[in-house]
């Protein structure tokens, strides 16, 4: 636990030193005036295009807001398979970094000072980090704007995922998709807001590659 405490301390230093612009992005998202049914042909075609993106990377900024603190960081997400993906958080103002790596043995969190923590139970480890259960294995789909097939979600008139809710271990995460990169096909998210009670994650994706 001592090493894990060091990781948390480092992550706080990393985030506080990072760029703050993503924290100023809008968070209020109104439900679309027109909600497209889930069996809409164009929406189903969009889902098929998203499903074909099985290995990809995304880079941008991530911000965290709670009543106690606000911080942000650059992120680099590399996804290969459900059992092989990684997330690196870093600042352009320091050499500190925090990495999450998933392999067949579970999830490992490590920092640039050599501290690390591993656990096969990824949800429990994520709860230790941010205080609530966070399904990191679902993040790959959330980032693409790809909901669960039978999930509770809303589609806007542009055939883009607008909102959804996800239940995990008694916790509820609500996701709102504020902006999309509409200059490419399929349209991929540009700004996502994830909320769980008083905690908010803002994710701005600046670069997609697949």
From Swiss-Prot:
One Gene Ontology CC term in the entry: cell outer membrane
InterPro entries according to UniProt: LolA/LolB/LppX, OM_lipoprot_LolB
Pfam families: LolB (PF03550)
Subcellular location: Cell outer membrane
Alphabetical keyword list: Cell outer membrane, Chaperone, Lipoprotein, Membrane, Palmitate, Protein transport, Signal, Transport
Signal peptide range in chain numbering: 1-18
Bilayer topology: Lipid-anchor
Single Gene Ontology BP annotation: protein transport
Lipid moiety-binding residues (S-diacylglycerol cysteine): 19
Residues lipid-modified (N-palmitoyl cysteine): 19
SUPFAM superfamilies, sorted: Prokaryotic lipoproteins and lipoprotein localization factors
Task of the protein: Plays a critical role in the incorporation of lipoproteins in the outer membrane after they are released by the LolA protein.
Family statement: Belongs to the LolB family.
Matches recorded under NCBIfam families: lolB (TIGR00548)
Complex formation: Monomer.
Protein known as: Outer-membrane lipoprotein LolB
Source organism per UniProt: Actinobacillus pleuropneumoniae serotype 5b (strain L20)
Gene from which the chain derives: lolB
């Amino acid at each position: 636990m001592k090493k894990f405490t060091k990781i948390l301390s480092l992550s706080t230093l990393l985030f506080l030193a990072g760029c703050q612009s993503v924290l100023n992005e809008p968070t209020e998202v109104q439900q679309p005036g027109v909600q497209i049914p889930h069996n809409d042909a164009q929406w189903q075609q969009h889902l098929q295009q998203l499903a074909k993106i099985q290995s990809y990377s995304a880079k941008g900024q991530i911000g965290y807001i709670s009543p106690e603190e606000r911080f942000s960081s650059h992120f680099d997400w590399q996804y290969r398979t459900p059992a092989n993906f990684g997330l690196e958080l870093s600042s352009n103002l320091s050499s500190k970094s925090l990495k999450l790596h998933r392999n067949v043995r579970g999830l490992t969190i490590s920092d640039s000072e050599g501290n690390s923590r591993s656990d096969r139970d990824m949800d429990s480890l994520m709860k230790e980090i941010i205080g609530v259960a966070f399904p990191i294995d679902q993040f790959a789909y959330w980032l693409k704007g790809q909901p669960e097939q039978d999930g509770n979600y809303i589609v806007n008139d542009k055939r883009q995922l607008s909102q959804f809710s996800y239940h995990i271990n008694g916790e509820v995460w609500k996701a709102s998709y504020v902006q999309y990169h509409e200059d490419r096909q399929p349209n991929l998210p540009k700004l996502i807001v994830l909320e769980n009670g008083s905690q908010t994650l803002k994710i701005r994706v600046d670069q997609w590659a697949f």
